């Protein structure tokens, strides 16, 4: 299966979307203040590539604030801690992440296109696999006692299914979706689904079904070439 990679001259702009095997060296953790300032400027330029996905200008700034938090040194990466660390109003950032209207699919399409520009090859490989995060509580969306590959056993946690891409030029993630265990769709979980903002029309899907959806969506975007699909057990 293959989509087409459109040829453009924007290769340099796309480098943040993946790891280029021949050009990237292992980080030495010796960044100077000047390096960090330059990085922040480059991140602003990079975010402008996604401008068309947002309805309002302030959403671009909110997305940049959120990215700063994810890339920062905070031990916890939830919205509240990110907002406090970035001196942003907590409710304002929570609204942006969870409720404000912006085009998620457009963000992914731009991201995938940039991967195609930098890493795309006709015989590239689409990769499907799952990843997990162990959780202590029961309030996180989709959390349940399930197999978590990160610890190699049944544990209380969240599991996501992910689509990646690899070629001789490098590799990158494209998109992921949270796996919602079947018990979460039971009537007794109605209040919890509502509290977590789970869409009312969401239905149970197996991990292979989610992986296939991710793959089909990537093909329909038609901006990344690959001839092979590889998947681990899901």
For each of these PLM feature ranges, what is it?
Residues 1-16:
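Short Lys/Arg-rich cationic patches that frequently serve as NLS/NoLS or arginine-rich RNA/DNA-binding motifs
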């Amino acid at each position: 299966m293959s989509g087409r990679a459109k040829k453009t001259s924007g290769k340099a702009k796309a480098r943040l979307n993946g790891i280029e095997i021949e050009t990237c060296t292992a980080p030495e953790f010796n960044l100077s203040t000047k390096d960090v300032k330059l990085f922040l400027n480059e991140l602003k330029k990079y975010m402008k590539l996604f401008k068309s996905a947002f309805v309002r200008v302030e959403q671009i700034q909110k997305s940049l604030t959120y990215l700063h938090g994810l890339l920062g040194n905070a031990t916890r990466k939830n919205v509240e801690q990110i907002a406090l660390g970035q001196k942003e109003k907590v409710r304002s950032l929570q609204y942006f992440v969870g409720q404000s209207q912006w085009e998620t699919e457009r963000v992914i399409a731009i991201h995938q296109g940039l991967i195609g520009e930098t890493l795309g090859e006709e015989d590239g490989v689409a990769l499907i696999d799952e990843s997990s995060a162990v959780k202590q509580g029961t309030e996180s969306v989709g959390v349940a006692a399930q197999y978590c590959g990160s610890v190699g056993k049944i544990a209380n946690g969240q599991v996501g299914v992910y689509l990646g891409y690899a070629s001789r030029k490098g590799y990158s993630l494209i998109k992921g979706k949270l796996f919602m265990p079947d018990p979460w769709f039971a009537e007794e979980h109605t209040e919890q689904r509502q509290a977590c903002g789970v869409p009312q029309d969401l239905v149970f899907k197996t991990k292979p079904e989610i992986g296939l959806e991710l793959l089909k969506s990537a093909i329909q975007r038609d901006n990344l070439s690959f001839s092979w699909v590889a998947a681990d057990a899901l």
